[in-house]
Amino acid sequence: MARLKITQTKSYIGSKQNHRDTLRSLGLKRLNDSVVKEDRPEFRGMVQTVRHLVTVEEVD
């Protein structure tokens, strides 16, 4: 199964509370933090919510 590497590229300062909560749920705590998650609809939806704060790469 494919995996996603999610990297926080922008600060959440000034963002809405639900965006901060989504970043925390993804496991991103600070700028340039990266996590690798399974490519599942749940994670895709979370990434879509904070797409302006993160970058996503597919990893094998």
UniProtKB/Swiss-Prot annotation:
An annotated Gene Ontology molecular function: structural constituent of ribosome
Keywords on record: Ribonucleoprotein, Ribosomal protein
Metal-binding is among the record's keywords: no
GO cellular-component term (any): cytosolic large ribosomal subunit
Gene3D superfamilies: Ribosomal protein L30, ferredoxin-like fold domain
GO biological process: translation
One Pfam family of this chain: Ribosomal_L30
Disulfide bond annotation, renumbered to this chain: none
Keyword Signal: no
Entry similarity comment: Belongs to the universal ribosomal protein uL30 family.
Quaternary data: Part of the 50S ribosomal subunit.
Protein name from the UniProt record: Large ribosomal subunit protein uL30
Coiled-coil parts of chain: none
Protein origin, superkingdom: Bacteria
